[in-house]
Amino acid sequence: MLRNKPRAAVTTKKQTSLLMADQPPPPKPNTCHCSPSLFSSPKFRFFTSKMMMTPFDSDFSLVSPTSILEANPSIFSSKNPKPVSYFEPTIPNPQRFHSPDVFGLADLVKDGDSNRDHSRKPVNKMVLFGSKLRVQIPSSADFGTKTGIRYPPCQLSPCVQTKVLAVSEIDQTEDYTRVISHGPNPTITHIFDNSVFVEATPCSVPLPQPAMETKSTESFLSRCFTCKKNLDQKQDIYIYRGEKGFCSSECRYQEMLLDQMET
């Protein structure tokens, strides 16, 4: 009996240890203490409650003092698709300007006729046609005879200056005009700058005849310019400046030295 008692005690201890092993361990106490300054904020509680209640693809905006999405719906939402025109750039409609009223000569004449019919006073037209213009242009054969301005045969207008110019002055003038009038009284008018010369018949103002430079009958190729030696056409002739002939290069060189000394 005494031997069976300790065996029974041992078996009871084994059974109790097996029962303790089958039961789950008790939960450990939560030792994490969150900071009350951050997680106790009402904004954080609202944010966590929203995150738990609403999925991420729903339309909600974060509450923050500087959020620009508080009053606007979420642009990342896929439940409300945007129309195609939402992504297209808006192009303003072009302004259409009315074409101005364009009037031609015929419209002006019609308006003038209508105004003249309705009003008693005549309307002065600003448009003149070529058929209504009465301008008589004398022909070239009658020029100077049918015009209103007439002068005696040898009388000139007081504004015309008559003077005799030298040949050198005429050559230097750049403005030169010659007018020939045909008809019963043909005249030739020469205009040199500010001077006017009229050549008419029977009396006329004599024009200065340019004096022709009398060239010597002897050509410059017939005699040497330096030594005055007659030049033979069969021999070489040296020319200087196109107007002086020489029999040799020495005579031409002497003339070239003289020209350099003079200049």
Swiss-Prot record:
Entry annotated with the keyword Cytoplasm: yes
Family in the record: Belongs to the FLZ family.
GO biological process: response to abscisic acid; response to glucose; response to mannose; response to sucrose; seed dormancy process
GO molecular function (one): zinc ion binding
Induction remark: Up-regulated by abscisic acid. Down-regulated by the transcription factor ERF114. Down-regulated by glucose, sucrose and mannose. Induced by abscissic acid (ABA).
Localization per record: Cytoplasm, Stress granule; Cytoplasm, P-body
Any one annotated GO CC term: P-body
Disruption phenotype: No visible phenotype, but reduced dormancy and fast germination of the seeds. Strong resistance of the seeds to abscisic acid.
Chief location of this protein within or outside the cell: cytoplasm
Function: May act as an adapter to facilitate the interaction of SnRK1 complex with effector proteins, conferring tissue- and stimulus-type specific differences in the SnRK1 regulation pathway. Involved in seed dormancy control.
Subunit: Interacts with KIN10 and KIN11 via its FLZ-type zinc finger domain. Interacts with KINB1 and KINB2 via its N-terminal part. Interacts with TZF4, TZF5 and TZF6. Interacts with MPK3 and MPK6.
Record's keyword annotation contains Zinc-finger: yes
Alphabetized PANTHER family for the sequence: FCS-LIKE ZINC FINGER 8, PROTEIN MARD1
Superkingdom, natural source: Eukaryota
Keywords, alphabetical: Cytoplasm, Metal-binding, Zinc, Zinc-finger
Protein name: Protein MARD1
Pfam families attached to this UniProt entry: zf-FLZ
First and last residues of each zinc finger (FLZ-type): 219-263
